[in-house]
Protein backbone atom coordinates (compact mmCIF):
# COMPACT_ATOMS: atom_id res chain seq x y z
CA UNK A 1 0.00 0.00 0.00
CA UNK A 2 3.01 2.30 -0.03
CA UNK A 3 2.20 5.15 -2.45
CA UNK A 4 5.77 5.31 -3.75
CA UNK A 5 5.94 1.57 -4.44
CA UNK A 6 2.60 1.81 -6.22
CA UNK A 7 4.14 4.35 -8.59
CA UNK A 8 6.92 2.03 -9.74
CA UNK A 9 6.31 0.76 -13.26
CA UNK A 10 6.93 -2.83 -14.36
CA UNK A 11 8.50 -3.26 -17.82
CA UNK A 12 10.25 -6.15 -19.51
CA UNK A 13 12.34 -4.79 -22.34
CA UNK A 14 15.74 -4.89 -24.05
CA UNK A 15 16.98 -1.70 -25.73
CA UNK A 16 20.52 -2.25 -27.03
CA UNK A 17 21.22 0.47 -29.60
CA UNK A 18 25.01 0.41 -29.39
CA UNK A 19 25.88 -3.29 -29.25
CA UNK A 20 26.70 -3.69 -32.96
CA UNK A 21 29.65 -2.93 -35.20
CA UNK A 22 29.80 0.74 -34.15
CA UNK A 23 30.30 -0.09 -30.48
CA UNK A 24 33.21 2.01 -29.21
CA UNK A 25 34.74 -1.10 -27.62
CA UNK A 26 35.53 -2.29 -31.15
CA UNK A 27 37.75 0.74 -31.81
CA UNK A 28 41.42 -0.12 -31.25
CA UNK A 29 43.90 1.95 -29.27
CA UNK A 30 45.80 2.66 -32.51
CA UNK A 31 42.63 4.04 -34.10
CA UNK A 32 42.07 6.40 -31.16
CA UNK A 33 45.71 7.52 -31.36
CA UNK A 34 45.29 8.11 -35.11
CA UNK A 35 42.33 10.40 -34.35
CA UNK A 36 44.46 12.44 -31.95
CA UNK A 37 47.35 12.58 -34.43
CA UNK A 38 44.95 13.75 -37.14
CA UNK A 39 43.87 16.78 -35.10
CA UNK A 40 47.45 17.53 -34.06
CA UNK A 41 48.45 17.58 -37.72
CA UNK A 42 45.49 19.70 -38.83
CA UNK A 43 44.98 22.05 -35.89
CA UNK A 44 48.29 22.67 -34.13
CA UNK A 45 50.41 25.51 -35.54
CA UNK A 46 53.54 25.95 -33.42
CA UNK A 47 54.45 29.15 -35.28
CA UNK A 48 51.73 31.19 -33.51
CA UNK A 49 53.68 32.86 -30.67
CA UNK A 50 50.67 33.56 -28.44
CA UNK A 51 49.84 29.85 -28.13
CA UNK A 52 52.16 28.68 -25.36
CA UNK A 53 50.67 25.21 -24.90
CA UNK A 54 47.99 23.00 -26.36
CA UNK A 55 46.35 19.63 -25.87
CA UNK A 56 44.39 17.12 -27.91
CA UNK A 57 42.45 14.44 -26.07
CA UNK A 58 39.97 11.68 -26.74
CA UNK A 59 38.01 9.21 -24.64
CA UNK A 60 35.09 6.80 -24.86
CA UNK A 61 32.67 4.95 -22.65
CA UNK A 62 30.18 2.11 -23.09
CA UNK A 63 27.65 1.23 -20.40
CA UNK A 64 25.20 -1.65 -20.29
CA UNK A 65 22.58 -1.57 -17.55
CA UNK A 66 20.52 -4.45 -16.21
CA UNK A 67 17.57 -3.43 -14.02
CA UNK A 68 15.44 -5.85 -12.00
CA UNK A 69 12.82 -5.05 -9.39
CA UNK A 70 10.84 -7.05 -6.83
CA UNK A 71 7.68 -6.02 -8.69
CA UNK A 72 8.91 -7.96 -11.73
CA UNK A 73 10.69 -5.40 -13.93
CA UNK A 74 13.43 -6.74 -16.22
CA UNK A 75 15.14 -4.08 -18.34
CA UNK A 76 18.40 -4.22 -20.29
CA UNK A 77 19.62 -1.04 -21.99
CA UNK A 78 22.91 0.45 -23.12
CA UNK A 79 24.55 3.80 -23.71
CA UNK A 80 27.83 4.99 -25.17
CA UNK A 81 29.70 8.23 -25.74
CA UNK A 82 33.00 9.24 -27.25
CA UNK A 83 34.81 12.55 -27.22
CA UNK A 84 37.56 14.49 -28.89
CA UNK A 85 38.78 17.96 -28.05
CA UNK A 86 41.48 20.46 -28.92
CA UNK A 87 42.45 23.08 -26.34
CA UNK A 88 44.81 26.06 -26.54
CA UNK A 89 46.43 28.19 -23.83
CA UNK A 90 46.92 31.69 -25.21
CA UNK A 91 48.99 34.42 -23.55
CA UNK A 92 48.89 38.07 -24.65
CA UNK A 93 50.52 40.85 -22.59
CA UNK A 94 50.94 38.54 -19.63
CA UNK A 95 47.27 37.52 -19.55
CA UNK A 96 46.54 33.84 -20.24
CA UNK A 97 43.21 32.59 -21.53
CA UNK A 98 42.28 29.18 -22.83
CA UNK A 99 39.74 27.81 -25.24
CA UNK A 100 39.16 25.41 -28.06
CA UNK A 101 36.56 23.01 -29.39
CA UNK A 102 35.10 19.85 -27.88
CA UNK A 103 32.92 17.21 -29.52
CA UNK A 104 30.80 14.57 -27.82
CA UNK A 105 29.22 11.97 -30.11
CA UNK A 106 27.86 8.44 -30.01
CA UNK A 107 30.17 7.01 -32.69
CA UNK A 108 33.87 7.52 -33.44
CA UNK A 109 33.21 8.26 -37.12
CA UNK A 110 31.25 11.34 -36.06
CA UNK A 111 34.34 12.75 -34.32
CA UNK A 112 36.28 13.01 -37.57
CA UNK A 113 36.57 15.91 -40.01
CA UNK A 114 35.92 18.88 -37.72
CA UNK A 115 39.27 20.61 -38.20
CA UNK A 116 37.83 23.70 -39.94
CA UNK A 117 35.48 24.31 -37.01
CA UNK A 118 38.35 23.85 -34.55
CA UNK A 119 40.56 26.34 -36.40
CA UNK A 120 37.73 28.85 -36.61
CA UNK A 121 37.26 28.59 -32.85
CA UNK A 122 41.01 28.89 -32.26
CA UNK A 123 41.12 32.08 -34.33
CA UNK A 124 38.15 33.47 -32.43
CA UNK A 125 39.95 32.95 -29.13
CA UNK A 126 43.13 34.49 -30.55
CA UNK A 127 41.19 37.54 -31.71
CA UNK A 128 39.62 37.86 -28.28
CA UNK A 129 42.98 37.59 -26.51
CA UNK A 130 44.59 40.16 -28.82
CA UNK A 131 41.79 42.71 -29.11
CA UNK A 132 39.35 42.40 -26.21
CA UNK A 133 38.72 45.55 -24.19
CA UNK A 134 37.11 46.03 -20.80
CA UNK A 135 33.36 46.58 -20.99
CA UNK A 136 32.00 49.78 -19.52
CA UNK A 137 29.52 49.13 -16.69
CA UNK A 138 25.90 49.54 -17.80
CA UNK A 139 22.90 47.83 -19.32
CA UNK A 140 23.26 46.30 -22.76
CA UNK A 141 21.08 44.41 -25.20
CA UNK A 142 22.83 41.10 -25.80
CA UNK A 143 22.54 38.46 -28.49
CA UNK A 144 23.32 35.13 -26.83
CA UNK A 145 25.00 32.17 -28.46
CA UNK A 146 22.81 29.04 -28.44
CA UNK A 147 25.12 27.33 -25.95
CA UNK A 148 24.76 30.30 -23.58
CA UNK A 149 20.98 30.32 -23.92
CA UNK A 150 20.93 26.60 -23.19
CA UNK A 151 23.06 27.06 -20.08
CA UNK A 152 20.79 29.81 -18.73
CA UNK A 153 17.71 27.65 -19.38
CA UNK A 154 19.38 24.64 -17.74
CA UNK A 155 20.47 26.46 -14.59
CA UNK A 156 17.68 28.98 -14.03
CA UNK A 157 14.71 26.91 -15.21
CA UNK A 158 15.69 23.27 -15.59
CA UNK A 159 16.80 22.68 -12.00
CA UNK A 160 13.67 24.39 -10.69
CA UNK A 161 11.67 21.84 -12.69
CA UNK A 162 13.26 18.94 -10.77
CA UNK A 163 10.43 18.22 -8.36
CA UNK A 164 12.52 16.84 -5.50
CA UNK A 165 13.76 20.38 -4.84
CA UNK A 166 10.30 21.56 -3.83
CA UNK A 167 9.22 18.70 -1.55
CA UNK A 168 10.40 20.53 1.57
CA UNK A 169 10.28 24.05 0.16
CA UNK A 170 6.87 25.65 0.64
CA UNK A 171 7.99 28.89 -0.97
CA UNK A 172 9.05 27.11 -4.14
CA UNK A 173 5.78 25.14 -4.23
CA UNK A 174 3.83 28.40 -4.08
CA UNK A 175 6.06 30.11 -6.65
CA UNK A 176 6.33 27.25 -9.15
CA UNK A 177 2.66 26.42 -9.80
CA UNK A 178 1.28 24.90 -12.98
CA UNK A 179 -0.36 27.42 -15.29
CA UNK A 180 1.84 30.31 -14.15
CA UNK A 181 3.28 32.58 -16.82
CA UNK A 182 7.05 32.66 -16.31
CA UNK A 183 8.50 33.26 -19.78
CA UNK A 184 8.06 34.66 -23.24
CA UNK A 185 5.38 33.32 -25.59
CA UNK A 186 8.32 32.26 -27.78
CA UNK A 187 9.68 29.84 -25.18
CA UNK A 188 8.62 26.19 -24.98
CA UNK A 189 10.81 23.60 -23.24
CA UNK A 190 10.47 19.82 -23.44
CA UNK A 191 12.36 17.04 -21.64
CA UNK A 192 12.65 13.59 -23.21
CA UNK A 193 14.90 10.71 -22.26
CA UNK A 194 14.34 8.67 -25.42
CA UNK A 195 15.88 11.13 -27.85
CA UNK A 196 19.21 9.85 -29.16
CA UNK A 197 21.20 12.70 -27.70
CA UNK A 198 23.02 13.72 -24.54
CA UNK A 199 21.03 12.37 -21.59
CA UNK A 200 19.58 9.45 -23.55
CA UNK A 201 17.82 7.01 -21.21
CA UNK A 202 14.82 5.07 -22.57
CA UNK A 203 14.21 3.91 -18.99
CA UNK A 204 15.30 5.75 -15.88
CA UNK A 205 17.02 4.16 -12.89
CA UNK A 206 13.72 3.28 -11.23
CA UNK A 207 12.56 1.42 -14.34
CA UNK A 208 10.21 4.15 -15.55
CA UNK A 209 9.77 4.47 -19.29
CA UNK A 210 10.87 7.83 -20.72
CA UNK A 211 8.10 10.31 -21.42
CA UNK A 212 7.67 13.54 -23.33
CA UNK A 213 7.37 16.09 -20.54
CA UNK A 214 6.51 19.62 -21.59
CA UNK A 215 7.87 21.81 -18.81
CA UNK A 216 6.82 25.05 -20.46
CA UNK A 217 4.56 25.86 -23.40
CA UNK A 218 4.59 29.39 -24.79
CA UNK A 219 5.96 30.70 -21.50
CA UNK A 220 3.45 28.90 -19.26
CA UNK A 221 4.46 26.21 -16.74
CA UNK A 222 2.92 22.92 -17.82
CA UNK A 223 4.95 20.18 -16.11
CA UNK A 224 7.85 19.15 -13.91
CA UNK A 225 10.28 16.26 -13.62
CA UNK A 226 9.67 13.39 -11.21
CA UNK A 227 10.93 10.25 -9.62
CA UNK A 228 8.48 7.91 -7.87
CA UNK A 229 8.76 9.69 -4.53
CA UNK A 230 8.15 13.23 -5.77
CA UNK A 231 5.33 12.07 -8.06
CA UNK A 232 3.63 10.31 -5.14
CA UNK A 233 4.04 13.25 -2.74
CA UNK A 234 2.78 15.85 -5.23
CA UNK A 235 0.11 13.61 -6.73
CA UNK A 236 1.49 13.80 -10.27
CA UNK A 237 2.54 11.31 -12.93
CA UNK A 238 5.98 9.76 -13.41
CA UNK A 239 8.18 11.33 -16.08
CA UNK A 240 11.18 8.96 -16.18
CA UNK A 241 13.70 11.34 -14.62
CA UNK A 242 15.16 9.30 -11.75
CA UNK A 243 18.85 9.28 -12.66
CA UNK A 244 21.63 7.57 -10.71
CA UNK A 245 25.30 8.44 -11.15
CA UNK A 246 26.01 4.70 -10.92
CA UNK A 247 24.69 1.62 -9.12
CA UNK A 248 26.50 2.88 -6.01
CA UNK A 249 24.20 5.90 -5.69
CA UNK A 250 20.47 6.34 -5.14
CA UNK A 251 18.58 7.88 -8.09
CA UNK A 252 17.81 11.60 -8.00
CA UNK A 253 15.42 13.69 -10.08
CA UNK A 254 17.49 15.14 -12.90
CA UNK A 255 17.05 16.42 -16.43
Segments from the language model and where they lie:
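Broad gene-expression machinery/nucleic-acid interaction feature
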Residues: 53, 74, 81-85, 139, ...
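Acidic low-complexity segments
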Residues: 1-77, 110-150
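Extended active-site and interfacial segments that coordinate phosphate-rich ligands
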Residues: 83, 103-109, 160-168, 229-244
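Dual-mode signal for accessory low-complexity, basic/Gly-rich regions
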Residues: 175-255
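Acidic, His- and aromatic-enriched active-site or binding-groove loops in soluble protein domains
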Residues: 74-87, 161-173
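Short beta-strand elements
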Residues: 75-105, 215-217
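Fold-independent oxyanion-binding glycine-rich loops
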Residues: 56-61, 89-91, 145-147, 191-194, ...
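Short acidic, glycine/serine/threonine-rich loops at helix termini
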Residues: 62-79, 96-102, 152-158, 200-203, ...
Amino acid sequence: NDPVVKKFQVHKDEVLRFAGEKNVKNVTRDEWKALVDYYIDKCIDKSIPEINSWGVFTSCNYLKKNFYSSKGAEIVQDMQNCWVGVNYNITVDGVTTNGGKFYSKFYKADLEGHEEEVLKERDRYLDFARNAVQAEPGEYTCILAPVTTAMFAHESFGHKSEADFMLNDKTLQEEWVMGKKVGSDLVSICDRGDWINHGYAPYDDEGTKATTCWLMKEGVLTGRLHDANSAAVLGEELTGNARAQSYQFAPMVRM
